Curated annotation (Swiss-Prot):
Family classification: Belongs to the small GTPase superfamily. Rho family.
Gene3D superfamilies noted in UniProt: P-loop containing nucleotide triphosphate hydrolases (3.40.50.300)
Cross-referenced InterPro entries: P-loop_NTPase (IPR027417), Small_GTP-bd (IPR005225), Small_GTPase (IPR001806), Small_GTPase_Rho (IPR003578)
PTM info: Although this sequence has a C-terminal -CXXX, it is palmitoylated at Cys-205, rather than prenylated.
UniProt-listed PROSITE patterns: RHO (PS51420)
Role of this protein: Acts as a negative regulator of abscisic acid (ABA) responses.
GO cellular-component term (any): plasma membrane
Membrane topology: Lipid-anchor
Binding site for GTP: 15-22, 62-66, 120-123
Organism of origin: Arabidopsis thaliana
Entries under Pfam families matching the protein: Ras
Protein name according to UniProt: Rac-like GTP-binding protein ARAC8
Length: 208
């Protein structure tokens, strides 16, 4: 029987600037896509959520991905229970930076904290008008996202669209499950104990 007292979970979103972290948080907390002013960083927010019969108080922390915030951003990592690490499915650079920048930063400042990997802007990956306006764009595929998840040891990989709200709730449900199901975390930790050798073909091989 679930306890009536809610468990507090601190969830911190990280990732390159302009990948849609703030939009995702606004969409999740307000159930609508922001069409007017979008702040650089979303105000900290907490909400009571029931996941699999367990009531949790989910605290959401947004962070700015730009280099100007490199010294301040890690201050938000203290006490984090889970990270939502986001990249844009239409930005190969943000995908590569998950491995090149964000994983090293999280391992340095918050080692051992579980990660949910998220590919944002899913709607634009199949948008013919958007793709025709951006010739040469190489969207990240689902299989490439899953390969990255395995390589960094993230517990889940989820693709979402804040504009259509598809899978936005699933992102944060997954973040909660990572914390309330320690057995899953232990299984993933065992996988991370033996890091893969060689390069990740879709991220680093053949790239500068």
């Amino acid at each position: 029987m679930a306890s009536s007292a809610s468990k507090f979970i601190k969830c911190v979103t990280v990732g390159d600037g302009a990948v849609g972290k703030t939009c995702m948080l606004i969409c999740y907390t307000s159930n609508k896509f922001p069409t007017d002013y979008i702040p650089t960083v979303f105000d900290n927010f907490s909400v009571n959520v029931v996941v699999e019969g367990i009531t949790v108080n989910l605290g959401l922390w947004d962070t700015a991905g730009q280099e100007d915030y490199n010294r301040l951003r890690p201050l938000s990592y203290r006490g984090a229970d889970v990270f939502v690490l986001a990249f844009s499915l239409i930005s190969r650079a943000s995908y590569e930076n998950v491995f090149k920048k964000w994983i090293p930063e999280l391992q340095h400042f918050a080692p051992g904290v579980p990660i949910v990997l998220v590919g944002t802007k899913m709607d634009l990956r199949e948008d013919r008008h958007y793709l025709s306006d951006h010739p040469g764009l190489s969207p990240v595929t689902t299989s490439q996202g899953e390969e990255l998840r395995k390589h960094i040891g993230a517990t889940y990989y989820i693709e979402c669209s804040s504009k259509t709200q598809q899978n936005v709730k699933a992102v944060f449900d997954a973040a909660i499950k990572v914390v309330i199901k320690p057995a899953v975390k232990q299984k993933e930790k065992k996988k991370k104990q033996k890091p893969r050798s060689g390069c990740l073909s879709n991220i680093l091989c053949g790239k500068n």
